[in-house]
Amino acid sequence: MTLRIETASNGRTATLRLIGHVESEYLDELRALVRTQRPRVVLDLHEVTLVDGAVVRFLIACEAEGIELQHCARYIVEWMNRERRREE
């Protein structure tokens, strides 16, 4: 399965719904899309089934920039927490 991205906006907030496998090969496209969706961006991860390490680091950076992560699977949250602790 590949990554599919659905975008919804109400004028103030853009929600990017990520569906499927989010792997490092898609990060350039995802970064560019996030940049064009300002001022407020939400990443909805409800239908994400797989991520890799580069994506976890990208999600950590997104949070640091104020991007909200919604419906993030427990394994991704735990992986992000481990990465943060490792960087300390």
PLM features: residue spans?
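Charged, elongated alpha-helical/coil segments that serve as electrostatic interaction surfaces
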Residues: T2-L3, R86-E88
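Short beta-strand/loop segment at the start of cytosolic alpha/beta domains
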Residues: M1-A14
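Amphipathic alpha-helical interaction surfaces in cytosolic regulatory modules
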Residues: L18-E87
